[in-house]
A protein has these predicted regions:
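Short basic helix-loop element that most often maps to the first helix and adjoining turn
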Residues: 2-21, 46, 71-73
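Short coil turns linking two alpha-helices in DNA-binding domains
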Residues: 14, 25-28, 40, 54
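DNA major-groove recognition helix of helix-turn-helix/homeodomain DNA-binding modules
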Residues: 23, 42-57
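Short, charged recognition helix plus adjacent turn
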Residues: 59-73
């Protein structure tokens, strides 16, 4: 999940900072970023809200960063 690490680095956050803000253990964040573990749906939503970005961006389905939740049409 390259975009998950990318957005963390862009925001100048450490994995520990993300852990403190989201409650997701640093060890899991590391595994998510390396692609060793897929986040649960619940954790994906927590991360999308924290970073204010779409699930598609976090899951590397798009390179276009849009806010979370997506705006209704």
């Amino acid at each position: 999940m390259k975009n998950l690490k990318l957005i963390r680095v862009i925001n100048d956050y450490t994995q520990l900072k993300v852990q403190m803000e989201t409650g997701i253990p640093q060890s899991m964040i590391s595994k998510y970023e390396k692609g060793d573990l897929m986040p649960t749906a619940e954790n994906l939503i927590i991360l999308a809200k924290f970073y204010n970005t779409s699930l598609d961006f976090l899951m590397d389905l798009t390179d276009e960063r849009t806010p979370y939740p997506p705006k209704s049409k």
